[in-house]
């Protein structure tokens, strides 16, 4: 399996420096590629999934890859696709986030220092020790401010007259230096990132060529949206996280089971590692039974992230909920510890906020008015409904938002 050919076939390709030469090198020798992740949260999410699948592909093709966690650059913040200065994250938060991100990645790839296992690095290791004056003297001359001002991440902010701090302006210099450092000490010759990173990546390519004259490349992936143009991994309830403590395997399964019909085959190629034969069968199934096709892709993608046991549980729960109208213990669960509240009763809008189906009581009210809320599969029409102890069947009720999001609410024993 040739890396670039498979990269293009799956739909990962957007833009590259000297694609012909990169293809030649990757077909004839081991490349060393790096992908970076900022550590702004305690888990990666579906929006990061394409980069993770690329790391898997590199490993499967026998190439070496490096994951760089931005322990240092996260303190600054990438201005790409941002309208305002990001909140400064503390060192303690960064360390917690790094631990969570590693857990996300370990679901998909193996870390080690053997021939083609993935190497995990934190750019804090080399950036924290940089002397500012020496950095300006040794590397500042290699960067053109004129060119930096034409980068989309900078240009768009200036055109919209939104503030761009000098702190953020330095981000692209540090990312470029990351590539130079990795090339010098780890023989890294390829940086891969999203299309919004093209300017930062090409600056790194230029820096390496100017300072060491080594042959390096940049490769970007498209910004992933669904058929409606919505960014991948975002829902009304926030990001779809990869770590199970932030998004249950069942909710992860439901996210993929709820994709649009037009996205099934595309997402199967991008995220499911379906073979050509499996894709052919899935295409035929999509034509005859779209729900079954979605169930298959949801199962396969959940299997990759959460393992067979959790994927089986999620599938069985979905079957019971939507085909047999039966709730199951594998649904996300919220436990009410103080049942005295239930003797008086809990307003439905308050309950929706408490269990996370609404962010505010006002939003809960709107969901009810839009016929979006059910309790034990019965539509809630009254925004003033009070949920009481007698509503619990066997000390459990199922609260549903639409057809796909369900939470078991239990009374503590």
Curated annotation (Swiss-Prot):
User: Where located?
Assistant: Cytoplasm
Main localization of the protein?
cytoplasm
Q: Give the EC number(s) listed in the UniProt record.
A: 6.1.1.1
Its GO CC terms are:
cytosol
Q: Which reaction does it catalyse?
A: tRNA(Tyr) + L-tyrosine + ATP = L-tyrosyl-tRNA(Tyr) + AMP + diphosphate + H(+)
Motif residue range(s): 'KMSKS' region: 231-235
Q: Where does ATP bind?
A: 234
The residue numbers the entry assigns to motif 'HIGH' region are 39-48
Protein origin, superkingdom: Bacteria
Listed A to Z, the keywords are: Aminoacyl-tRNA synthetase, ATP-binding, Cytoplasm, Ligase, Nucleotide-binding, Protein biosynthesis, RNA-binding
Q: What class of enzyme is it?
A: ligase
A GO BP term, please?
tyrosyl-tRNA aminoacylation
Every S4 RNA-binding domain range: 346-411
Residues given in the record as L-tyrosine binding sites? 34, 171, 175
What are the GO MF terms of this UniProt record?
Answer: ATP binding; RNA binding; tyrosine-tRNA ligase activity
- Name the CDD domains for this protein: TyrRS_core
PROSITE patterns, sorted: S4
Which family, according to the similarity comment? Answer: Belongs to the class-I aminoacyl-tRNA synthetase family. TyrS type 1 subfamily.
What does it do?
Catalyzes the attachment of tyrosine to tRNA(Tyr) in a two-step reaction: tyrosine is first activated by ATP to form Tyr-AMP and then transferred to the acceptor end of tRNA(Tyr).
| Subunit details | Homodimer.
What is the protein name given in its UniProt record?
Answer: Tyrosine--tRNA ligase
Upper taxonomic classification of the species?
Bacteria, Pseudomonadati, Pseudomonadota, Alphaproteobacteria, Rickettsiales
Q: Gene behind this chain?
A: tyrS
């Amino acid at each position: 399996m040739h890396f670039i050919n498979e990269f293009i076939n799956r739909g990962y390709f957007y833009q590259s420096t000297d694609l012909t030469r990169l293809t030649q090198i990757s077909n004839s020798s081991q490349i060393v590629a790096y992908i970076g992740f900022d550590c702004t949260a305690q888990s990666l999410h579906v929006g990061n999934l394409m980069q993770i699948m690329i790391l898997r592909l590199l490993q499967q093709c026998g190439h070496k890859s490096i994951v760089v966690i931005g322990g240092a650059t996260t303190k600054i913040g990438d201005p790409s696709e941002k309208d305002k200065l990001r909140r400064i994250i503390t060192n303690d938060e960064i360390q917690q986030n790094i631990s969570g991100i590693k857990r996300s990645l370990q679901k998909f790839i193996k870390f080690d220092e053997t021939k083609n296992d993935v190497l995990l690095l934190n750019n804090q290791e080399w950036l924290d020790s940089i002397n500012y004056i020496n950095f300006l003297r040794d590397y500042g001359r290699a960067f053109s401010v004129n060119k930096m001002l034409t980068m989309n991440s900078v240009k768009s902010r200036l055109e919209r007259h939104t503030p761009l701090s000098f702190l953020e302006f330095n981000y692209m210099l540090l990312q470029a230096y990351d590539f130079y450092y990795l090339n010098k000490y780890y023989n890294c010759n390829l940086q891969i990132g999203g299309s919004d990173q093209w300017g930062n990546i090409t600056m790194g390519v230029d820096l390496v060529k100017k300072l060491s004259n080594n042959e390096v490349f940049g490769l970007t992936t498209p910004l992933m949206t669904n058929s409606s143009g919505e960014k991948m991994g975002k829902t009304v309830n926030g990001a779809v996280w990869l770590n199970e403590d932030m998004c249950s395997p069942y909710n992860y399964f439901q996210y993929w089971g709820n994709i649009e019909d037009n996205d099934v085959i595309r997402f199967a190629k991008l995220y499911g590692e379906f073979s050509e034969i499996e894709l052919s069968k899935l295409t035929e199934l999509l034509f005859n039974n779209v729900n079954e096709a979605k169930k298959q892709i949801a199962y396969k993608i959940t299997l990759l992230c959460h393992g067979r046991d959790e994927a089986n549980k999620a599938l069985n729960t979905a079957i019971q909920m939507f085909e047999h109208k039966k709730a199951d213990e594998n649904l996300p669960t919220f436990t009410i510890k103080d049942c005295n509240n239930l003797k008086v009763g809990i307003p439905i809008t308050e309950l929706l906020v408490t269990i996370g189906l609404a962010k505010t009581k006002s939003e809960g009210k709107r969901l009810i008015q839009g016929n979006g809320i059910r309790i034990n599969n019965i539509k809630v029409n009254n925004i003033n409904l009070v949920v009481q102890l007698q509503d619990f069947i066997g000390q459990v009720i199922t609260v549903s938002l639409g057809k796909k999001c369900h939470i078991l609410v239990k009374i503590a024993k």
